[in-house]
Amino acid sequence: MRVRKRKGAEEHLANNPHYVILNPEDAKGRWHDVFGNDRPIHIEVGSGKGGFITGMALKNPDINYIGIDIQLSVLSYALDKVLASEVPNVKLLRVDGSSLTNYFEDGEVDMMYLNFSDPWPKTKHEKRRLTYKDFLDTYKRILPEHGEIHFKTDNRGLFEYSLASFSQYGMTLRQIWLDLHASNYEGNVMTEYEEKFSNKGQVIYRVEANF
């Protein structure tokens, strides 16, 4: 979902280097040094306005979180949430999800989240979907053996495509929810998008998958 260009967004990010890693390639292989501890590292690709990553960081202070989004204005809103929450265990990156191996060593990330990714519904755009096999190649490299992906969407077509993509890649579909908010699943942290559309009755799909 595109967000209107925000005036001063670039300066906002540049003025907060404690949270926004401006040269993430320099952190490759040393993310524990960046955080100053050896706690697990979880990343969210397509972190949007930061509601999920901030909520997870508040809920799990013993885990380090990295929110990743390519959109400048969106990431600046995520920074607002991080600053307001004063969470010490969050960093933000403005990079593309296809280039993660430039910023993380093999096995350096413990878990990753894909929340409400662009569905790219046209067949000619299949390679842009974040659950396309080329993206899975990248994720597999930066995650440990049997690394885990948690995926949420409100788009039934993307969900079915992603289940098939995970399965064809040889991943294990550990748990599947066809209506997350109607289930007994506890501990769900919502994104801004999820909260908005679930309040309108939109069904939310979720899967946990392992390599």
From Swiss-Prot:
Gene3D superfamilies from the UniProt entry: Vaccinia Virus protein VP39
Enzyme Commission no: 2.1.1.33
Binding site for substrate: K122, D154, T191, E192, Y193, E194
Keyword field: Methyltransferase, S-adenosyl-L-methionine, Transferase, tRNA processing
Class in the EC hierarchy, top level: transferase
GO MF, any single term: tRNA (guanine(46)-N7)-methyltransferase activity
Gene Ontology cellular component terms for the protein in this record: tRNA methyltransferase complex
Active site positions: D118
Biological or metabolic pathway of the protein: tRNA modification; N(7)-methylguanine-tRNA biosynthesis
Record region (Interaction with RNA): 124-129
Catalyzed reaction equations: guanosine(46) in tRNA + S-adenosyl-L-methionine = N(7)-methylguanosine(46) in tRNA + S-adenosyl-L-homocysteine
Binding site for S-adenosyl-L-methionine: E44, D69, D96, D118
Signal peptide stretch: none
SUPFAM superfamilies in the record: S-adenosyl-L-methionine-dependent methyltransferases (SSF53335)
Pfam families on file: Methyltransf_4
Function comment: Catalyzes the formation of N(7)-methylguanine at position 46 (m7G46) in tRNA.
Family listed: Belongs to the class I-like SAM-binding methyltransferase superfamily. TrmB family.
Protein name per its UniProtKB record: tRNA (guanine-N(7)-)-methyltransferase
Phylogenetic lineage: Bacteria, Bacillati, Bacillota, Bacilli, Lactobacillales
